[in-house]
């Protein structure tokens, strides 16, 4: 997940639990695979062992080549058709498919990224970050959850249809698309793949990372886990604020210098409250949960634009970041730049880099106007230095229903709702092409698991991998029927 997504994914898990605690006070053939657990003896599945090896290959953004070539070779040995989209240093992107892409078949595309973020101080890890340690029924290491675990789930699910595809002419292709550079904005990965994606892949749907499951939420009265399938996400752009001053450079006589103007401006901007916005995506998410909940409380929630519910949201959103993420744009200070040359010399130019996340329907121009209004500074220069695709939405349709069916089949009593992902992923490059795109990590996750993403002690449970494979196998099988 890109940049600040680890925090945002944690917000996803906490969002509904916080919201409700405040509001309520409260028949084609395919290869069968053995379950990971038999009786009292734990059996480590082939998929888990595969993931352990994959995690042990470091693939920090820009250094994905070794991991990419290993993964492509493994997919080839499993009988998948390999096609490199790009094959350059720091930019390897390949497809592993049931049929060659040249077949032109309509295509179900599973998307994952091979790059990971830096591990940080390895001494702070419970286990080394690049050894793929299997312990406590978990695979530990950088990328085990984000995003190598999902890749293994996708590959092992699609592999189970290789023999069938060789015997019969299936009505569609299934592809696992493995890309580079997601953690740094996708410019070496999905941005390149998307250029001729429709012509080369003939996609019916793209399924990438996104929502996941939360277990036994009290407001659903113990009926089972709640899964969110993301249908939209926030857009991303980097904004640069620059201040210049021609005051004397010596620190002992400086007046209203650039550093002071920057500090005062950033204080005002970063403490300015963003307006609460009920997007149609958030409205659909809240109303879907309300329908699942039922009763008087569910009826209130099923109308999230009502004065009663909006009053509640405005009262609590500012105090609860996990709720605020869904309902507001976000500006985060991500870096500072200075022309300062010595400690007794005042810099005449200072700059701040802002990581900005936009709700669907919001525009870069609108956010720039918000920045100007908050700063009230005629001397600041504002420029957009990087901008991803504008946030678009996939309306839930046939493939959403199949994913929901697969989750409900695997997890007893599960409820599935569409959701807005308060983060940015590579999914946005493909939504921008007008293709149905959904985000799903097909597993139940815990707060400690999500908090470890992009941090220390990242892990994925063995059972997450095995059950996730079953979900996607069920999805593909249902599509064939």
Place the predicted regions along the sequence by residue.
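Bacterial N-terminal signal peptides
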Residues: 13-22
């Amino acid at each position: 997940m890109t940049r600040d997504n680890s925090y945002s994914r944690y917000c996803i898990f906490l969002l509904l639990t916080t919201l409700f605690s405040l509001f309520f006070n409260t028949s084609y053939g395919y290869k069968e695979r053995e379950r990971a657990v038999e009786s009292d003896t734990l059996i480590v599945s082939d998929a888990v062992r595969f993931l352990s090896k994959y995690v042990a290959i470091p693939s920090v953004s820009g250094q994905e080549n070794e991991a990419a070539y290993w993964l492509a070779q493994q997919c080839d040995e499993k009988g998948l058709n390999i096609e490199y989209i790009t094959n350059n240093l720091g930019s390897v992107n390949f497809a592993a498919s049931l049929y060659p892409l040249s077949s032109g078949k309509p295509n179900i595309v599973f998307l994952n990224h091979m790059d990971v973020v830096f591990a940080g101080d390895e001494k702070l890890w419970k286990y080394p970050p690049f050894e793929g340690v299997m312990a406590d029924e978990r695979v530990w290491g950088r990328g085990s959850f984000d995003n190598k675990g999902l890749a293994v789930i996708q590959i092992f699910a699609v592999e189970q249809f290789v023999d069938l595809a060789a015997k019969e002419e299936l009505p569609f292709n299934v592809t696992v698309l493995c890309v580079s550079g997601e953690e740094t904005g996708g410019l070496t990965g999905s941005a390149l793949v998307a250029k001729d994606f429709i012509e080369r892949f003939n996609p019916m749907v793209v399924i990438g990372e996104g929502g996941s499951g939360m277990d036994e939420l009290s407001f659903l009265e113990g009926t089972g886990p709640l899964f969110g399938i993301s249908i939209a996400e926030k857009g991303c752009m980097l904004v640069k604020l620059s201040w210049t001053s021609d005051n004397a450079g010596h620190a002992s006589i400086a007046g209203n210098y650039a550093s002071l103007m920057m500090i005062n401006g950033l204080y005002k901007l970063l403490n300015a409250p963003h307006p609460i916005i009920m997007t149609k995506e958030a409205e659909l998410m809240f109303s879907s949960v309300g329908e699942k909940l039922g009763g008087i409380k569910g009826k209130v929630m099923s109308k999230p634009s009502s004065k009663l519910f909006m009053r509640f949201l405005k009262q609590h959103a500012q105090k609860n970041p996990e709720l605020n993420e869904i309902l507001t744009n976000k500006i985060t200070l991500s870096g500072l730049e200075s022309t300062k040359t010595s400690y007794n010399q005042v810099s005449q130019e200072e700059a701040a880099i802002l990581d900005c996340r936009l709700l669907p329907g919001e525009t870069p121009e609108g956010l720039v106007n918000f920045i100007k209004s908050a700063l009230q500074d005629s001397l600041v220069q504002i420029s957009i230095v990087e901008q991803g695709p504008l946030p678009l939405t996939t309306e839930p349709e046939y493939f959403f229903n199949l994913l929901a069916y697969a989750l409900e089949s695997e997890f007893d009593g599960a409820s599935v709702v569409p959701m807005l992902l308060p983060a940015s992923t590579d999914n946005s490059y493909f939504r921008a092409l007008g293709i149905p795109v959904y985000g799903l990590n097909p597993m139940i996750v815990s707060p400690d698991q999500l908090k470890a993403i992009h941090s220390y002690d990242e892990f994925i449970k063995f059972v997450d991998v095995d059950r996730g494979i079953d979900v996607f196998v069920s999805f593909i099988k249902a599509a064939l029927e």
